[in-house]
Design a protein with these regions (language model features):
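Hydrophobic/proline-rich hinge and linker segments of small-molecule sensing/allosteric domains
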Residues: 134-138, 159
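N-terminal subdomain of lithium-sensitive/metallo-dependent phosphomonoesterases centered on the IMPase/IPPase/PAP
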Residues: 1-87
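Residue-level signal for inorganic ion chemistry
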Residues: 20, 45, 56, 90, ...
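Solvent-exposed alpha-helices and their adjacent loops that cap or buttress functional pockets
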Residues: 74-76, 109, 127, 150-154, ...
Length: 235
């Protein structure tokens, strides 16, 4: 039912990833700050978003779009809305760390029906469609259906989290929550890309994840991937 959209998104996500890899670990990142000194954007964020948006408007001119850098675009009031984070994990990217991702979701009448997350450097592609399950394609080309971890206890679980950019307003910034939960779990990871974190949850590579003050574009695609892999997403 949603194959048309998936077949459109796959090359789109990979094309955005190629833009990011072209700048990665180079001297021409064009790093700027946004809301504060901790919140950064790069030339690759802007160019990959423009590439995605242009393709969507060319193929689906009647659709709406919400994206991280450009905000609301396209046709207001459309039954279809695309939710895009062109480069999730910009801090990692700007530091030369390889965990970052392209996140593209499509909503129909407010419900997410397709989600794709692509980690360009790692060569990992995750996707899901409503009622169609969740899948991952590795760099080698192997495709497998995803299923979340079956672990039932915190003591055996490895969790992931992240930290908001509002350190000036909220000094605790999730560190208080981390301190409370550390004694009860096997370990905690901070990968630096919410979309990739959640994709790892869907793949059973991590057992749980929480984060504060995320935006819709951070998690829209990956939330569907988690749900279609048998996971639970709550706010």
């Amino acid at each position: 039912m949603y194959d048309e959209f998936l077949n459109f998104i796959f090359p789109l996500a990979k094309g955005a990833g190629e833009i990011q890899l072209a700048y990665f670990r180079g001297d021409d990142l064009g790093i700027e700050t946004k809301s504060n000194a901790y919140d950064v954007v790069t030339r690759a964020d802007k160019e990959s978003e423009a590439y995605i948006v242009q393709a969507i408007l060319g193929r689906y001119p009647g659709h709406g779009i919400l994206c991280e850098e450009g905000g609301v675009m396209g046709t207001a009031g459309s039954d279809y809305r695309w939710v895009i984070d062109p480069l999730d994990g910009t801090t990692n990217y700007s530091q030369g760390l390889p965990i970052f991702s392209v996140s593209i979701a499509l909503q129909h009448n407010g419900e997410t029906v397709v989600g794709v997350v692509y980690a360009p450097y790692l060569g990992e592609l995750f996707w899901a469609s409503k009622g169609g399950g969740a899948y991952m394609k590795s760099r080698s080309g192997e495709v497998k259906r995803l299923q979340v971890s079956a672990k039932q206890t915190l003591a055996t679980s490895v969790l992931a989290t992240g930290f908001p950019y509002d350190k000036d307003v909220n000094p605790d910034n999730n560190s208080d929550n981390v301190a409370r939960i550390v004694p009860y779990v096997r370990d905690i990871r901070r990968l630096g890309s919410a979309a990739y974190d959640l994709s790892c949850i869907a793949a059973g590579l991590l057992d749980g994840y929480w984060e504060l003050d995320l935006h819709e574009w951070d998690v829209c695609a990956a939330n569907l991937i988690v749900r279609e892999a048998g996971g639970v997403v709550c706010d």
